[in-house]
């Protein structure tokens, strides 16, 4: 199951980008034998200032056809890392070939786009800068693959 991070904004070179790349490479290596991956990032940018609706249109175009859509949103469901791993495995086992995670810009995701998503995921009640949300998602993808592979990365 391919995983696409569809995100608003461009991340410059720096520690956040390095962390994302590192965790996604780890996810690809660990997930390959599990039917997970590869992972990619599609960055979209509304240069015309059309707000959340314009960002939503760009994000919709970035989502692979037929993909499970999971929106990251503070109103979404919080879950443990093992629950997240089970969700990934469930979509994979249901024969879904693509999974797209949506991360909005500074104002979040458009309401209609959130409603379109099959799943909504929250990293807690706090609001996170989108660059940190990207890092956290990349790490949780790797952690989920490690849990499913039975490696010692996830310790409780």
UniProtKB/Swiss-Prot annotation:
**Principal location class:** cytoplasm
A GO molecular-function annotation? rRNA (pseudouridine-N3-)-methyltransferase activity
One Pfam family per UniProt = SPOUT_MTase
Q: What does this protein do?
A: Specifically methylates the pseudouridine at position 1915 (m3Psi1915) in 23S rRNA.
**Annotated positions binding S-adenosyl-L-methionine:** 72, 104, 123-128
Q: Write down the HAMAP family for this protein, in alphabetical order.
A: 23SrRNA_methyltr_H (MF_00658)
Gene3D superfamilies the UniProt entry points to: 3.40.1280.10
The kind of enzyme this is, by top-level EC class, is transferase
UniProt similarity note: Belongs to the RNA methyltransferase RlmH family.
Q: Which UniProt keywords apply?
A: Cytoplasm, Methyltransferase, rRNA processing, S-adenosyl-L-methionine, Transferase
The protein's matches in InterPro entries, at most eight in alphabetical order, are given as: Alpha/beta_knot_MTases, RlmH-like, tRNA_m1G_MTases_N
Q: Which residues form a coiled coil?
A: none
Q: What is its EC number?
A: 2.1.1.177
The entry's protein name is Ribosomal RNA large subunit methyltransferase H
Please write the reaction equations for the catalytic activity of this protein: pseudouridine(1915) in 23S rRNA + S-adenosyl-L-methionine = N(3)-methylpseudouridine(1915) in 23S rRNA + S-adenosyl-L-homocysteine + H(+)
One GO cellular component term: cytoplasm
Please describe the quaternary structure of this protein: Homodimer.
The record's subcellular locations are:
Cytoplasm
- What is the species listed in this Swiss-Prot or TrEMBL entry? Dinoroseobacter shibae (strain DSM 16493 / NCIMB 14021 / DFL 12)
């Amino acid at each position: 199951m391919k995983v696409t991070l569809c995100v608003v904004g461009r991340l410059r070179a720096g520690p956040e980008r390095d962390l994302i790349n590192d965790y996604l490479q780890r996810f690809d290596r660990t997930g390959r034998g599990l039917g997970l991956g590869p992972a990619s990032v599609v960055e979209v940018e509304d240069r015309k200032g059309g707000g959340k609706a314009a960002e939503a249109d760009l994000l919709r175009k970035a989502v692979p056809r037929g993909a499970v859509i999971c929106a990251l949103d503070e109103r979404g469901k919080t879950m443990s890392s093992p629950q997240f791993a089970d969700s990934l495995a469930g979509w994979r086992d249901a024969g879904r070939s693509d999974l797209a995670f949506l991360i909005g810009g500074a104002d979040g995701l458009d309401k209609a786009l959130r409603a379109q998503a099959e799943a909504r995921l929250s990293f807690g009640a706090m609001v996170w800068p989108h660059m940190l949300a990207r890092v956290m998602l990349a790490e949780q993808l790797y952690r989920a693959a490690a849990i499913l592979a039975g490696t010692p990365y996830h310790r409780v």
